[in-house]
Design a protein with these regions (language model features):
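Flexible glycine/proline-rich, aromatic-decorated loop/lid segments
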Residues: 183-198, 404-406
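Acidic/His- and Gly-rich active-site-bordering loop/insert found
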Residues: 2-109, 128-135, 315
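Acidic/histidine-rich catalytic neighborhood of metal-dependent amide-processing enzymes
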Residues: 104, 112-186, 446-448
Length: 448
């Protein structure tokens, strides 16, 4: 075991206070630019060269530094956060770091800003201890992850040299039933779609429902043609490209248990879909694509009963290997037309990306898992992917490099709800894990 540099907990808390104290929710472009400037300053203070690239949305911050060995690791992060929602639901100001009973609270502390701060402190600890890094790093922090990363791919295509690396590591995912972070050798892809039904040019009295089409009913009928109450996605060809898990993936899937008790307690759900539990639950989350409806509204919104002018639904699909975003959009268009619903307008929303996948026995993925023994007393379990998306496809495709992600948040972390939190030691260990990964990368011949 190496004697790793040690992260300063005091400095980590100081950085968290700065980042959590800056509002930067999805779509708040001015606020996100301010957060990006702060992150750039933090990177410079830790000895990284920095380039802040403007986009039509939030800036993408890129920091880099070479190391003793030519191997370079790209670290993907994001700094945009979900809206805090009603502040009255929070025990603390969501944009002020709070500490209580070994936990830290604040919007972004468990997903986004917290893991980024942990990794920046890991880099700083290495430089402070040794004067240099064991190998090179490229840190990428974007502010439009939650809207599908619409500007990351174009920037990479335009500024390819800024991102060049030999492997990619991200922060995201779950923990197993024992609380140990899971290691993933891939991530699901994403496509988001808006469906719109429009009839009359103005809202009409409800009594006209006997003679005038209602766009909300029309939209509901369309949605019923997309997915059944048995969770089967009905779009023609949707599943055709999917390949089942490999023999090795199946072996792993039979052994991993999710933190079901933690989920049920934190989320206040009695059971999971179809009563799934144990290995079948994990297998479902890892291997299946999804079709989720996350918004449904009418225009205009009206308290008195009316026939609305239009109705809108927003869907998101999480994709597994061999599925492609535009192919899903095209298949949905053809499917609704075949069902006599060609009047439903379909709009692919900005962003989205294919899945990224490395073999679970890839040497880099194994390295990320194996060094877990130095931090957690045992290697991390490797899953091919989990119930989340990230735009790692861009890096994997551009450079032909392996990708991996390490779970951070817990079921109780409430990364989309009030009182987002995480045990402070979890963030410290997340940073220490990176230190061990960098040491291990410098001692291998992983690079091409």
């Amino acid at each position: 075991m190496t004697e790793p540099a040690v992260i300063s907990t005091d400095q980590l808390i100081c950085d968290l206070e700065q980042l959590i104290g800056m509002a930067g929710s999805t779509g708040q472009t001015d606020e996100l630019r301010t957060v990006a400037a702060r992150i750039a300053a933090m990177m410079r203070n830790r000895g990284l060269k920095v380039d802040v690239r403007p986009t039509p949305g939030a800036p993408i911050v890129i920091g880099w530094r070479g190391g003793r060995q030519p191997f370079t690791l790209l670290l993907y992060h994001h700094y945009d956060t979900p809206s805090p929602g009603p502040w009255r639901a929070w025990l603390h100001d969501p944009f002020q770091l709070a500490e209580r009973d070994g936990m830290v609270y604040g919007r972004g502390v468990a997903d986004g800003k917290g893991p980024l701060a942990a990794h920046l402190n890991a880099i700083a600890a290495l430089i402070d201890a040794e004067g240099e890094l064991p190998c090179g790093v490229v840190v990428v922090a974007e502010g439009d992850y939650l809207t599908g990363s619409p500007y990351l791919g174009p920037l990479l295509a335009d500024r390819r040299a800024l991102f060049r690396a030999d492997a990619c590591l991200a922060s995201g995912g779950d923990r197993d039933a024992s609380g140990l972070p899971l290691c993933y050798s891939g991530v699901k892809g994403l496509v988001q779609i808006m469906l719109r039904s429009q009839e009359a040019q103005t809202a009409l009295p409800a009594g006209m429902a006997a003679s005038v089409p209602n766009p909300l009913w029309r939209l509901i009928w369309a949605l019923n043609q997309i997915k059944t109450d048995q969770e089967e996605i009905l779009i023609g060809g949707f599943y055709d490209a999917i390949e089942g898990p490999t023999t090795e993936e199946n072996r792993v899937l039979r052994t991993v248990l999710a933190d079901e008790a933690g989920r049920r307690s934190a989320w206040q759900v009695d059971q999971f879909l179809f009563g799934l539990t144990g290995a079948p639950l994990v297998r479902s989350e890892v291997t299946l694509p999804t079709c989720n409806i996350n918004m449904l509204h009418t225009e205009p919104v009206s308290d008195p009963p009316v026939i609305p002018r239009s109705a809108v639904a927003r869907l998101d699909f999480q994709l597994v290997p061999r599925q492609r975003p535009q192919a899903v959009v095209d298949a949905l268009q053809a499917h609704l037309a075949a069902k006599g619903l060609s009047d439903i307008l379909i709009e692919r929303l900005p962003g989205g990306y294919p899945p990224a996948q490395s073999p679970i026995d890839d040497p880099f993925v194994r390295l990320v898992s194996d060094v877990g023994r130095y931090i957690h007393g045992q290697p991390l379990t490797i899953l091919p992917r989990g119930p989340f998306t990230m735009p790692l496809f861009y890096f994997a495709e551009a450079f032909g490099i392996p990708v991996a992600s390490i779970g951070v948040a817990r079921p109780s972390s409430a990364i989309f709800g009030a009182n987002e939190c995480i045990p402070l030691p979890d963030l410290v260990r997340h940073g220490q894990h990176l230190i061990e990964v960098l040491y291990a990368c410098s001692a291998t011949t992983l690079s091409a």
